[in-house]
Amino acid sequence: VSGCGGSSLPEPEQATPAPLKQGEAIEVPFPPPPARVEFIPEKPNSGAVWIDGEWSWTGRRWAWTYGRWVIPPSSATFARWRTARTSDGILLFAPGTWHDERGAQIAEPLPLAVGVAREGEVILPHGQPEKTAPNQVPAKTPQAH
């Protein structure tokens, strides 16, 4: 069982994050909810690494992307999703991204296995609770480019 971060599972090499800047990140009106707790499937391959589940911004609300086992691209690093406030209080969001050895963004590898969220509830921006089912279909599935 896992939530975002703090995992003892094999993880990809982490990219050093640059400071978030307007124009390079997405402006969002409010922070994401707390991470969902997920049941992590058995590691499907000895070379696989675990990418924790994460929130992504849909333009209107936060959507959960389930954690997943992937084979990392050769010499690639992974920059975790993050939020930051500008000096004037604007909240910025940058999704998790993969980068090649030159730092260029590359497509996320297809998942070998995906985590399953436990049943629970998230609170929407205006305070309304929304139920989450344990086997809810992921809001976003990584796509090959």
Annotated model-derived regions:
Residues 1-3:
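Sec-dependent bacterial lipoprotein signal peptides
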Residues 5-8:
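Bacterial signal peptide processing site
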Residues 10-140:
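Low-complexity segments
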Residues 143-145:
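Short, solvent-exposed mixed-charge patches
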